[in-house]
Amino acid sequence: MPWLQVRLAISPEQAETYEDALLEVGAVSVTFMDAEDQPIFEPDLNTTPLWSHTHLLALFEADADPEQVFAHLRLLTGAELPEHQAEVIEDQDWERSWMDNFQPMRFGRRLWIVPSWHDAPEKDAVNLLLDPGLAFGTGTHPTTALCLEWLDGQQLEGTQVLDFGCGSGILAIAALLLGAREAVGTDIDVQAIEASRDNAQRNGIADEKLALYLPEHMPAMQADVLVANILAGPLVSLAPQLSGLVRPGGLLALSGILAEQGEDVAAAYAADFELDPIVVRDGWVRISGRRR
């Protein structure tokens, strides 16, 4: 069935007023969207920030009159409306549309990420089966891609790999499929641990090959390879801990870092690692190196 969609261009200060007003005039859903592709990272505790330029989208039953909606909004807010528009959108099979947009992706020479509803494009390649999720990483983000390509370029046979902040487990699983002897994943989120375990089982990874821990339960170790795709702030503050988790001569790859943060993160690791040139993609960077 079709829907009437109302769009308002608002500031963060207007958000609550217009959200309440739209619900009061009959909206069945209200959604906030970034109007200018402006990222928000590492917000202050107990805050839910909005973008400085936000689109507020509201859905109404198809027979709603947009002019009446706008008139009621003016009455309820006591002000002229910000930039606004209304359009009828057709319903569709959203699940099918979403699935069609997620295709197999190649990283480096050998590695593919393949959703369950697709055949592997190259049967003899290293194929990691992973369906897209909402929270933990599927290879579509530049930072994940940078880490996957780096792993594909390493000689991982016989190594122990630590995936710090494992999320979906995609990096640890990729390392195992690329030849690592064993992998360890750690994350502060219990759901991430479960997602990693489920994805490992889907890819035929034996339980003894992948150990998963909350940080407080992780044993002392020094890995041959450490990958961490988290945020710049934690990467800097945890630099002594992460450096200590890599054996002398071992390898490190870090991402989740905006381009303008790259030099600061690199500086936090320069004393302990011989660093490679920073790799940049779509405003994000990867920092890698070898433990001194």
Curated annotation (Swiss-Prot):
An annotated Gene Ontology molecular function: protein-lysine N-methyltransferase activity
At the top level, the lineage of the source is Bacteria
Mainly resides where? cytoplasm
The answer on whether this UniProt entry bears the keyword S-adenosyl-L-methionine reads yes
Q: Does the keyword Endoplasmic reticulum apply?
A: no
GO terms, biological process: methylation
Q: Where in the cell is it found?
A: Cytoplasm
Q: Which reaction does it catalyse?
A: L-lysyl-[protein] + 3 S-adenosyl-L-methionine = N(6),N(6),N(6)-trimethyl-L-lysyl-[protein] + 3 S-adenosyl-L-homocysteine + 3 H(+)
EC number(s) per entry: 2.1.1.-
Record keywords, A-Z: Cytoplasm, Methyltransferase, S-adenosyl-L-methionine, Transferase
One GO CC annotation, please? cytosol
Which Pfam families does this one have? PrmA (PF06325)
Database matches in InterPro entries: Ribosomal_L11_MeTrfase_PrmA, Ribosomal_PrmA_MeTrfase, SAM-dependent_MTases_sf
List of residues binding S-adenosyl-L-methionine:
T144, G165, D187, N229
Summarizing the function annotation, the protein's role is: Methylates ribosomal protein L11.
Family note? Belongs to the methyltransferase superfamily. PrmA family.
NCBIfam families recorded: prmA (TIGR00406)
Q: What is this protein called?
A: Ribosomal protein L11 methyltransferase
Q: Which gene encodes it?
A: prmA
